[in-house]
Amino acid sequence: MGQTVTTPLSLTLEHWEDVQRTASNQSVDVKKRRWVTFCSAEWPTFGVGWPQDGTFNLDIILQVKSKVFSPGPHGHPDQVPYIVTWEAIAYEPPPWVKPFVSPKLSPSPTAPILPSGPSTQPPPRSALYPALTPSIKPGPSPIMADLSLTFSQKTLRRTEDRDRPPLTEMATEKRPPPLLRFLPPLP
């Protein structure tokens, strides 16, 4: 009568539909083969203590996540869906994971708590000052003023366009307009 050892990886594979549902809730898609590869071969090489059989330890998962999300060539964007799914399973464990997750401890204070009493220091003061903005004079905006010009006035204002032929001439030309000249001919 052989008994098998249950590991985080084997447990997730036994409940694969739940894993995929969790991934879907994270708006990602995971494949079983890559799930096994990342868990058993990739993440153990990151040097953060990830075991080949997986873990539900959030500290280790977050360290792997940090490596996966590293910018540039050190990151692993193809592994993002997988590590965020592991994290989601460990953070809000389904019933089949709960026996394998250590209870969350309330964070202990890292600095000593000072006794409360009358303070000898003056209250802190802010060095912030209100921003001074220039006053805006009411009047027509340049856009609205431009709308009042006639077509011929606008044409004259465009000095950079004076050497171009008018649109009416371009419509009667035998060659295509300037932008279409650079496109390959249609078959």
Curated annotation (Swiss-Prot):
One of its GO terms (cellular component) is virion component. It comes from the Viruses. Pfam families: Gag_MA. A motif (LYPX(n)L motif) lies at residues 128-132. Residues 157-176 have a biased composition (Basic and acidic residues). The keyword Lipoprotein applies. GO terms for molecular function: RNA binding; structural constituent of virion. Residues 107-187 are annotated as: Disordered. A lipid is attached at G2 (N-myristoyl glycine). The keyword Isomerase does not apply. Late-budding domains (L domains) are short sequence motifs essential for viral particle budding. They recruit proteins of the host ESCRT machinery (Endosomal Sorting Complex Required for Transport) or ESCRT-associated proteins. Matrix protein p15 contains one L domain: a PTAP/PSAP motif, which potentially interacts with the UEV domain of TSG101. The junction between the matrix protein p15 and RNA-binding phosphoprotein p12 contains one L domain: a LYPX(n)L motif which interacts with PDCD6IP. This is Gag polyprotein. It comes from Friend spleen focus-forming virus (isolate 502). The lineage of its organism: Viruses, Riboviria, Pararnavirae, Artverviricota, Revtraviricetes. The gene is gag.
